[in-house]
């Protein structure tokens, strides 16, 4: 029996040795794997807890280590957790305020005083008389006759001019029917002032028992009319007369040739910087309301330069202001109109100019002011108007008023089919004339109301230029010439200019335009919140709340990236687990076959095991041992 157990003991010893070797091999593999993990170029944490604990133990952000070092005291851990995340919230609230201020794009206004030579601005003077009445008398005779009758009906005023020669009467008879028809479609009426009228139409300074004046413009079928109301009869008559006047001008093909372009008949004397002006120093244009206009220093190739301030270092003009041959219903003001503007900019006399009084010396002192705005995201300005959706109808450079007037004229041409006589025409358009465009007045005045209410969007579309040069003006007045000197002054002027001044003091005026001081003001904008300022503010807040640096931010970014990586790894592992759970489960036939191969456990022979053996055989070795025993029993 003992001899039979010896081979069996040998087998068991061999199995023990094999089990020990297998265990040592597995331990070596585990150690090698740990070594490879420690020496790996890129390693990942096995759980979120491991990641968070590593971050708190090694980060340079203040307060993070207190989240793990006090984990044995849950109260402290909870306190530091609340404090840590509350501090984070406060810091990012401050970040939000800083970012909001940065993206509002604030600017700093820089004020500079420059003392250098000035470029003298352009100066425009107008006669305040559109045309010589004698040159247009034949064309205006019929309109004057209808106006005279209208004034008689409304105000019992006999407007007798004493200028009705035979030629004018024949002209009136030939064209009376055509003009009378159009005037009758746009009548001037007097209305009883309504107590329920709007405040604009019902001025509180005018008695309610008084009358208000209006003229009507109707559409082609006379089914709808627009009434242009005026509280002043003078304004109403002048506007009504001007409306018919521009219709007459649009019919005259050679209206521009009626201009009085003789410089000497309007400008008696011209001197700049105590040097006499010549013809190369001015340009001429005509305005349908303000008449002949002369612009000095408009030539950009030879501009006047002013080295010193003062009245003797500027422009001095003596102009004629008599009204012997003015159109009475248009020229209600005597004198001249002057405007100071930049070169290559149109002179809008109705907006930026002011009148010069006859018999008065007007001294205009100027202060130059330049404004440079930041474009792009800092302000809604334009560099040259190329990005403004309005076609420039003027030949000058872009200004806000050029854009607004071009926008209005384009709207008139689009809606009414013709252009207003006061503005330049787009290509292919014609000026409005109620002989050709019957209801253009109705269209124009309704469009004018929309324009003033900004329903056309012109004031919104037209942006301010980024660079603007303005001149602040202040005027002083004195009697000129004085009583003691007027005799010889008028005598010399009448002999020198070969013009007989009948009204004397009301026939001339003097204008002086000069710089008030040596320096001029320049306003510039600079960004108040740059990227450098933004980073400085963010760094200050980060250091205030956590006492950290840029590298601490990098650590936080690394934590976020590791968190994302672990999440991806766990997600992939979870998907693999779900796929392995979908494999087929072994059937009962397979189980029965397995049990048929192995005998019942009680039938196996028992082997004696030495008590000094600590390591147990592996499952595979025992399985092979059982199979051998079964085969030996079957052999026996």
UniProtKB/Swiss-Prot annotation:
Keyword Transmembrane helix carried by entry: yes
Annotated keywords: Cell membrane, Cell projection, Cilium, Cytoplasm, Cytoplasmic vesicle, Disulfide bond, Flagellum, Ion channel, Ion transport, Membrane, Sodium, Sodium channel, Sodium transport, Transmembrane, Transmembrane helix, Transport
Extracellular side, ranges: 99-549
Membrane topology, Cytoplasmic segments: 1-77, 571-636
GO CC term, one of those recorded: plasma membrane
Gene Ontology BP terms: sodium ion transmembrane transport
Subunit structure: Heterotrimer; containing an alpha/SCNN1A, a beta/SCNN1B and a gamma/SCNN1G subunit.
Annotated protein name in UniProt: Epithelial sodium channel subunit alpha
UniProt source species: Anolis carolinensis (Green anole)
């Amino acid at each position: 029996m003992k001899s039979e157990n010896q081979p069996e003991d040998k087998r068991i010893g061999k199995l023990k040795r094999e089990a020990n070797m297998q265990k040592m091999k597995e331990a070596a593999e585990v150690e090698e794997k740990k070594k490879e993990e420690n020496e790996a170029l890129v390693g990942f944490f096995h759980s979120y807890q491991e990641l968070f604990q590593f971050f708190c133990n090694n980060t340079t952000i203040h307060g993070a280590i207190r989240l793990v070092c006090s984990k044995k005291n849950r109260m402290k851990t909870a306190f530091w957790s609340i404090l840590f995340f509350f501090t984070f919230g406060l810091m990012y609230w401050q970040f939000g305020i800083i970012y909001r201020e940065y993206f509002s794009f604030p600017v700093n206004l820089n004020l500079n005083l420059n003392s250098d030579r000035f470029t003298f601005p352009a100066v425009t003077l107008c006669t305040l008389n559109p045309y010589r009445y004698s040159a247009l008398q034949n064309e205006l005779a019929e309109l004057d006759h209808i106006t005279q009758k209208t004034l008689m009906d409304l105000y019992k005023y006999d407007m007798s001019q004493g200028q009705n020669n035979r030629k004018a009467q024949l002209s009136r008879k030939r064209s009376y029917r055509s003009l009378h028809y159009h005037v009758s479609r746009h009548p001037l009426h007097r209305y009883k002032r309504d107590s329920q009228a709007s405040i604009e139409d019902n001025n509180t300074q005018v008695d309610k028992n008084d009358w208000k004046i209006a003229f009507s413009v109707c559409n082609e079928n006379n089914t709808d009319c627009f009434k242009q109301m005026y509280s002043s009869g003078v304004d109403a008559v002048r506007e009504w007369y001007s409306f018919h006047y521009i219709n007459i001008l649009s019919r005259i093909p050679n209206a521009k040739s009626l201009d009085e372009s003789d410089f000497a008949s309007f400008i008696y004397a011209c001197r700049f910087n105590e040097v006499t002006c010549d013809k190369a120093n001015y340009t001429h244009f005509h305005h349908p309301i303000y008449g002949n206009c002369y612009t000095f220093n408009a030539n950009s190739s030879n501009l006047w330069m002013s080295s010193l301030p003062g009245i003797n270092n500027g422009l001095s003009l003596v102009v004629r202001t008599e009204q012997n041959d003015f159109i009475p219903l248009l020229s209600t003001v005597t004198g001249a109109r002057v405007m100071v503007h930049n070169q290559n900019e149109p002179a809008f006399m109705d907006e930026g100019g002011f009148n010069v009084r006859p018999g008065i010396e007007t001294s205009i002192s100027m202060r130059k002011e330049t404004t440079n705005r930041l474009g792009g995201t800092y302000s809604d300005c334009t560099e040259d108007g190329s990005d403004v959706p309005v076609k420039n109808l003027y030949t000058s450079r872009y200004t806000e008023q050029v854009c607004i007037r071009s926008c209005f004229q384009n709207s008139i041409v689009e809606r009414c089919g013709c252009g207003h006589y006061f503005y330049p025409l787009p290509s292919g358009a014609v000026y409005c004339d109620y002989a050709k465009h019957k209801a253009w007045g109705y269209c124009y005045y309704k469009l004018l109301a929309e324009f003033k209410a900004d329903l056309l969007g012109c004031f919104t579309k037209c942006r301010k230029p980024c660079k603007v040069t303005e001149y602040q003006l202040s005027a002083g007045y004195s009697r000129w010439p004085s009583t003691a000197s007027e005799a010889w002054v008028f005598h010399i002027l009448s002999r020198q200019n070969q013009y007989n001044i009948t009204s004397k003091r009301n026939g001339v005026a003097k204008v002086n335009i000069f710089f008030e001081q040596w320096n001029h003001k320049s306003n510039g904008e600079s960004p108040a919140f740059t990227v450098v300022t933004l980073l400085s503010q963010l760094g200050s807040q980060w250091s205030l709340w956590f006492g950290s640096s840029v590298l601490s931010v990098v650590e936080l970014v690394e934590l976020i990236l590791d968190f994302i990586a672990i999440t991806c790894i766990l997600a992939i592992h979870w998907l693999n687990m779900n796929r392995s759970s979908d494999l087929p489960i072994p059937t009962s036939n397979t189980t029965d076959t397995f049990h048929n191969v192995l005998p019942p456990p009680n039938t196996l022979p028992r082997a004696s095991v030495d008590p000094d053996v600590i390591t147990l055989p592996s499952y595979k070795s025992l399985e092979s041992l059982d199979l051998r025993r079964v085969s030996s029993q079957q052999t026996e």
